[in-house]
Amino acid sequence: MEVLPPLDWEKVGAETWGDVGGQIKQMGIGKVAKGLLLSSIQERTKTWDGIFRPVRQPEWWQGDGEYHGPKYTEPVSELERRLKLGEFVVACEIAPPLSASTNKLNSNIDLVKPYVTAINFTDNASATPRMASWACSKIAIERGAEPVMQIAARDRTRAGLQGEILGAAALGVRNVLCVTGDSPVLAPQPRGRMDINDLDAIQMLWILRRMRDEGRYLDGREVKFPPKFFLGAAASPFASTPKFQALREHKKVNAGAQFFQTNLVYDIERMEIWLNELAKRDILNKVYILVGITPLKNLKMARYMTDVPGVYIPESILKRMEAAEVAGNSQEEGVQIALELARKIKGYEKQGVHGLHIMPVGWEDIVPRIVTEAGLS
């Protein structure tokens, strides 16, 4: 279970290679060179391990490759309750406001609440500051909605994570989605430092599962009143080859993930390949999967999405959007594509899919129509 592996982002960032460089200096550049160039295979392997293992496997990390199911039996949230009952659930995402005003946030919550089981609030998506996910989650609870609080490792230390989760639990938050977080390279200038990454999503899941199920802080102290929450993680079927992505998802399940919300899916056949890879690892019966979709507003948005890491849009969909753009009805075509995808995704209930996660990207008004016309209400 490595720290900041290449599969988290498009490529390894400077923060990882900086640690590697520091480890080489600590071992001695001459000793490393000799170990890699002049020694036997065994010595070369030992040298490589000496460089990378301290970076990838910090001393405090005690995770393993085994599955650790939740220690509780009764659902802790409405989302978990419905999933356990076998319902095909619908969740949606609302972007937190860029200011302290909650007017638009309140109206969006009220708009989608009758149509979805849970509402996900992102945590500084694209490394851009917004209202905190825990604050949006508390507002949702006050308005009678079920929140999914997203928490990004990018902005957390080990101490900060544990303190924040206790506060969220005290506010009534029961669904937590752990993500590594978008790279700070996406942030507006002046950006924060790129070399501070204390945790990744897998380690977050492991820490939070232990707090909940074992009643222990990372340092071993007892949590007298452990927090209760349904632990989730992000999954990205197209971020790399399905075989390697399934390995990443497997690690998250072993660490504590009980449900996945996937990145955008526009190619159902490739999604099926990913599901088959998960099945080979025998984890489909250990995690609930909510597949993500976003309605395309226009051709420009479709083309932009093709450059987003982890998103794949088939040529057939791009051609449909191009034709619709010429005809002047690209927005409606985008809705029809989303409806087709939603119906097809629901058809995978017996193959490991348990729900739909709609990411409207500021187009919350379209959520009721998608849910209703796709037959999901």
Regions found by a protein language model. Give the residues of each.
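Short, acidic/polar
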Residues: 23, 99-111, 133, 159-165, ...
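Conserved, mostly hydrophobic/aromatic
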Residues: 93, 119, 168, 252, ...
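Conserved N-terminal beta1-alpha1 strand-loop-helix module at the mouth
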Residues: 17, 21, 58-118
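Catalytic beta/alpha-barrel core
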Residues: 119-129, 151-152, 178, 259-267, ...
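Active-site mouth loops of central-metabolism enzymes
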Residues: 89-103, 147-159, 229-244, 323-336
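Active-site-adjacent beta->alpha loops and helix N-cap segments on the catalytic face
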Residues: 43, 47, 101-102, 127-138, ...
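Active-site pocket-lining/capping segments in soluble small-molecule metabolic enzymes
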Residues: 1-20, 45-52, 67-78, 181, ...
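Glycine-rich anion/phosphate-binding loops
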Residues: 153-171
